[in-house]
Amino acid sequence: MATYCDEPVDSYFYSSYNPYMGRYPRHRDAGWKYKSYLSHYGDTSEAFSNQQRAQLKSILSQINPKLTPRLRKANTKDVAVQVNPKRDASVQCSIGPRTLLVVKRELRRRRKLNPGPPGTPQKTEGEVRYPRTLAVYSPIAFRSVTSFLVETGKDRPAAEAQAEELPGEQPEQKGGENQAGEETNANLPEQRKPQSEDAQTAADAEGSKGKARVRFQFLEQKYGYYHCRECNLRWESAYVWCVQGTNKVYFKQFCRKCQKDFNPYRVEDITCHVCNKARCACAETQRHVDPKRPHRQDLCGRCKGKRLSCDSTFSFKYIV
């Protein structure tokens, strides 16, 4: 081999053919490990596939908004929390349109296989409304309480009431039509009016008795007096939760010694005894009940760690 300045020239020349060029990776040893910052974040191919999918979706949406890439099976790594689409459709997480579309397809297929009786209205998924949670002390709550009423007996239309109340009169009327002719047909609407009005008023009276009941009840804060006979201990508390408009106590309180639960033997509104106001407006301030500062601070330690503790102030509370 020729030499240049007494040095071999082999080290300066390389073969024009590299067997490891192209897409085939070079052979590595068994103990070799590629170190990269992307190794801590899962498979890089998955990340690139998601990026390519997003780019493809944006390109297709620019061409035609109806064109979207084929939906693949949802991956739990990308999705995080999944809920049951059949039961919890109202609280669907942002997992894409696949689950809801599948539910709609199943509903359409079931409706086609099992059509209802003729004349029944078909409900759509878009008509379902889920009311928001409202606070007790919010002014919106008292205005929209009627929206949570469940109607047990809905008002029936006059046509249905006539059909139910007058089933036996139809053959008699038919016989009268055959006998009397057109004159009786002209007088029939006048005879039906008072009967239909009586039937409608009777149905309204029955429906008004058990018309509706509230789905959940609001709670209000009151003042209560407690007495434990075993420990011979009395205490007062301004954290007595009662059903709104009544003295029905919903949560019991515990004695600080024996830890037994008790209902108050007396409950009163959190107001001044003289002016009957929540904020006392008397010239000489008498005993006033403040919800945030009960009278006996030494007795409030009995409720620590309980569900309703005096340490925390609740802005609202309701029973579902």
From Swiss-Prot:
Region (Disordered): 106-130, 155-208
InterPro entries xref list: Zar1, ZAR1/RTP1-5-like_Znf-3CxxC
Entry's Gene Ontology cellular component terms: cytoplasmic ribonucleoprotein granule
Zinc fingers (3CxxC-type) by residue: 222-305
Main location: cytoplasm
A biological-process GO annotation: oogenesis
GO molecular function, one term: zinc ion binding
Domain of life: Eukaryota
Alphabetic keyword roster: Cytoplasm, Developmental protein, Differentiation, Metal-binding, Oogenesis, RNA-binding, Zinc, Zinc-finger
Entry's family note: Belongs to the ZAR1 family.
Free-text note regarding domains: Disordered regions undergo liquid-liquid phase separation (LLPS) for the formation of membraneless compartments that store maternal mRNAs in oocytes. The 3CxxC-type mediates binding to the 3'-UTR of mRNAs.
The protein's name in its UniProt record: Zygote arrest protein 1
Species of provenance: Takifugu rubripes
